[in-house]
Amino acid sequence: MHLRITQHLRIMYRSIEDFLSTRKEEESSTVKLFSNLTEETKSVKIHENVRSLERLAWHITQTLTEMGKNAGLFETDLLHELPIPATLPELIETYVNYNTLLMRTVRLKWTDSNLDDLVNMYGEEWKKGKILSVLIAHESHHRSQMTVIMRMLGLPVPGIYGPSKEEWASFGMPPMD
């Protein structure tokens, strides 16, 4: 799965600070989205081939340590095979804690000058700067999936990169089609 997604990703970070700034913004967007989930709908599967909202949220969270371990940032995959946290607040807290750990570890272990270094990832050689880009793109990809499921379940969807349908009214404008 990761290989198909990343084969087309040609962009990469050349600055740790640029990545950390983007990563913090993405964390805010992810927490905003996770905060709109409900305990009543988190485990609903809208189709047998579609993950539940909580499973997608947990996948986003687990990827922080899974990719971090594969990239050499962590000794072990700290969240591997752990169950989904029982409540949404616990899931959000876990996401924030491990995102913070990832950012701190990137800052400590990697430098701008080694972002061109190659790391074996999923049977391919990736530059460290590409790994950072994939972390961002992967999370955005799965958040997008979550917004569709949220709409289908009747949950409000927050704007991430622009206003959502629900937010257009606050601008005094009708929602765009």
Say what each PLM segment does.
Residues S15-D18:
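Short Lys/Arg-rich basic patches
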